[in-house]
């Protein structure tokens, strides 16, 4: 069967149409494979999802690591953080095993008080037992004939520098006097003066008492006169006991002569204080009373 001319023409037109439409269909198929999602989104936009990343941004889950690796990295970051914290604590000195003892706050030092008078120092040291103890040590050394050892102790006390030198010298003088080493006592006394240390009333009184207790009465009167010339006066016990020793050894007239010598040096007898002292020491030898008041004890106005 031979096709008609109309059929041939129709077939040619269909073939031509097929040749034209085939590339466009293939192109459409090509586009659909590469950008199909874009065409779909433009035509039918999807429903919004929570935390959906914007277009062009990398999703946080695009390179998700395995759970084991995530746990390892998490532990590593925590360790790094804790190490940094530890270093900061170490710098600040916190949580250390061996803590340093905190230093006490330093306050500005107050100025030292002015030095006390030597007489006041003597009084406090006698009350505290320091001078008696020093004298006892020196006295024991001197009585045992250990004068060199006593002088070494004396030098050691001086080198310490914590006690005024007049106190140390006087303690040595008193120790020698109690050991009846009067020449050594006088030598130390003169050494004190030669070194520029002025004896005080206590120093003179110690030496005068040591002298009249050893019956060295002329020296006792001489040092008592020197004491007055230096601006010091013997106290009542020293004066009365010196007069009593003079009366016992040399008689009343010699005692009265010594009193007159002291009066010429500026010594004034405190009658009331002397009477009170002698009454407390009663019965006191009448010769001393007579030498001081120039009258017999029976004539005393009580």
Curated annotation (Swiss-Prot):
Biased composition (Basic and acidic residues): 54-67
PANTHER family from the UniProt entry: OS03G0856100 PROTEIN, TETRATRICOPEPTIDE-LIKE HELICAL DOMAIN SUPERFAMILY
Keywords: Repeat
Residue stretches of biased makeup (Polar residues): 26-40
InterPro entries per record: Pentatricopeptide_rpt, TPR-like_helical_dom_sf
UniProt keyword Transferase, yes or no: no
Domain of life: Eukaryota
Region (Disordered): 26-82, 94-116
NCBIfam families: PPR
PPR repeat windows: 130-164, 165-199, 200-234, 235-269
Xref: PROSITE patterns: PPR
This protein's name: Pentatricopeptide repeat-containing protein At4g38150
Stated family: Belongs to the PPR family. P subfamily.
């Amino acid at each position: 069967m031979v096709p008609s001319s109309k059929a041939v023409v129709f077939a040619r037109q269909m073939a031509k149409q097929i040749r034209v439409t085939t590339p466009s269909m293939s192109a459409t198929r090509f586009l659909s494979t590469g950008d199909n999602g874009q065409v779909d989104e433009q035509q039918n936009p999807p429903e919004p999802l929570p935390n959906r990343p914007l277009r062009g941004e990398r999703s946080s889950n695009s390179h998700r690591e395995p759970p084991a690796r995530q746990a390892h990295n998490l532990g590593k970051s925590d360790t790094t953080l804790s190490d940094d914290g530890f270093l900061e604590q170490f710098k600040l000195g916190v949580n250390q095993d061996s803590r340093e003892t905190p230093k006490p706050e330093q306050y500005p030092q107050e100025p030292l008080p002015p030095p006390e008078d030597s007489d006041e120092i003597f009084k406090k040291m006698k009350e505290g037992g320091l001078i008696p103890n020093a004298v006892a040590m020196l006295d024991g050394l001197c009585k045992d004939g250990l004068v060199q050892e006593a002088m070494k102790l004396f030098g050691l006390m001086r080198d310490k520098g914590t006690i005024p030198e007049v106190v140390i010298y006087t303690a040595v003088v008193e120790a020698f006097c109690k050991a009846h080493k009067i020449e050594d006592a006088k030598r130390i006394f003169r050494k004190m003066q030669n070194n520029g240390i002025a004896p005080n009333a206590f120093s003179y009184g110690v030496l005068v008492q040591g002298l009249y207790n050893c019956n060295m009465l002329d020296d006792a009167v001489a040092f008592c006169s020197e004491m007055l010339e230096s601006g010091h006066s013997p106290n009542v016990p020293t004066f009365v006991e010196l007069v009593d020793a003079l009366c016992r050894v040399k008689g009343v007239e010699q005692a009265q002569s010594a009193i007159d010598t002291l009066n010429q040096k500026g010594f004034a007898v405190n009658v009331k204080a002397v009477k009170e002292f002698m009454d407390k020491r009663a019965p006191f030898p009448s010769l001393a009373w007579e030498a001081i008041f120039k009258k017999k004890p029976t004539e005393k106005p009580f």
